Protein backbone atom coordinates (compact mmCIF):
# COMPACT_ATOMS: atom_id res chain seq x y z
CA UNK A 1 0.00 0.00 0.00
CA UNK A 2 1.35 3.43 -0.92
CA UNK A 3 2.04 5.73 2.00
CA UNK A 4 3.63 9.18 2.19
CA UNK A 5 7.31 9.15 3.11
CA UNK A 6 7.17 11.98 5.63
CA UNK A 7 4.53 13.50 7.82
CA UNK A 8 3.06 16.74 6.49
CA UNK A 9 3.81 19.65 8.79
CA UNK A 10 0.99 21.29 10.71
CA UNK A 11 1.65 24.64 9.05
CA UNK A 12 1.40 23.17 5.56
CA UNK A 13 -1.74 21.26 6.52
CA UNK A 14 -3.33 24.36 8.05
CA UNK A 15 -2.36 26.48 5.04
CA UNK A 16 -4.06 24.05 2.66
CA UNK A 17 -7.15 23.87 4.83
CA UNK A 18 -7.32 27.67 5.09
CA UNK A 19 -7.09 27.98 1.30
CA UNK A 20 -9.90 25.48 0.86
CA UNK A 21 -12.07 27.25 3.44
CA UNK A 22 -11.38 30.64 1.86
CA UNK A 23 -12.46 29.36 -1.55
CA UNK A 24 -15.59 27.79 -0.07
CA UNK A 25 -16.49 31.00 1.77
CA UNK A 26 -16.05 33.03 -1.42
CA UNK A 27 -18.32 30.69 -3.38
CA UNK A 28 -20.93 30.81 -0.61
CA UNK A 29 -20.80 34.61 -0.62
CA UNK A 30 -21.24 34.71 -4.40
CA UNK A 31 -24.16 32.27 -4.25
CA UNK A 32 -25.87 34.31 -1.54
CA UNK A 33 -25.35 37.53 -3.47
CA UNK A 34 -26.73 35.96 -6.64
CA UNK A 35 -29.74 34.61 -4.76
CA UNK A 36 -30.47 38.03 -3.29
CA UNK A 37 -30.22 39.73 -6.68
CA UNK A 38 -32.54 37.15 -8.25
CA UNK A 39 -35.12 37.63 -5.49
CA UNK A 40 -35.04 41.41 -5.78
CA UNK A 41 -35.17 41.28 -9.58
CA UNK A 42 -31.84 43.04 -10.06
CA UNK A 43 -30.11 40.09 -11.73
CA UNK A 44 -29.02 40.99 -15.25
CA UNK A 45 -27.39 37.67 -16.15
CA UNK A 46 -30.59 35.70 -16.52
CA UNK A 47 -33.05 35.63 -19.39
CA UNK A 48 -36.50 34.63 -18.30
CA UNK A 49 -38.87 33.29 -20.97
CA UNK A 50 -41.90 35.47 -21.59
CA UNK A 51 -45.01 33.78 -20.24
CA UNK A 52 -47.74 33.84 -22.84
CA UNK A 53 -51.25 32.69 -22.04
CA UNK A 54 -51.11 30.22 -24.93
CA UNK A 55 -48.12 28.39 -23.46
CA UNK A 56 -49.52 28.20 -19.94
CA UNK A 57 -52.74 26.50 -21.10
CA UNK A 58 -50.88 23.64 -22.77
From Swiss-Prot:
It comes from the Bacteria. Keywords: Ribonucleoprotein, Ribosomal protein. Disulfide bonds: none annotated. Belongs to the bacterial ribosomal protein bL32 family. Pfam families: Ribosomal_L32p. NCBIfam families: rpmF_bact. One of its GO terms (biological process) is translation. One of its GO terms (cellular component) is large ribosomal subunit. It comes from Synechococcus elongatus (strain ATCC 33912 / PCC 7942 / FACHB-805). This is Large ribosomal subunit protein bL32. The keyword Ribonucleoprotein applies. GO terms for molecular function: structural constituent of ribosome. The keyword Transmembrane does not apply. InterPro entries: Ribosomal_bL32 (IPR002677), Ribosomal_bL32_plant/cyanobact (IPR044958), Ribosomal_zn-bd (IPR011332). Residues 1-24 are annotated as: Disordered.
